[in-house]
């Protein structure tokens, strides 16, 4: 898009196409831009759309990753996954964590155990990692055992 000013309208158009009716973005970083808002429902939709992209799906499950940029001045960027559930909670394949003073501690996570998927969208948590891990484990505890 070339600039934040050009990118944000495209970001909002994609959100509408994904059915994210409760979201409006004002900043590509997810920080507290004026008028920016979202909902757990919309973030679940966004997470599902992101995980459907092979390049994203391959990286969100890693504790660390690198990405090579394209074009003039191409370089390799290193990332550390900020989702503390990755590599620590059985089956978690990542997604996104964040914090702002208005939204509090937030996390979007998906875990896969056997044939079952559990999605978690937590917003405004005081303590997110232990709470999220417990919620994921509790959700899987409700899944019936496979038949022999």
Task: Write out the residue ranges for each language-model feature.
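Penicillin-recognizing serine hydrolase domain
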Residues: 2-148
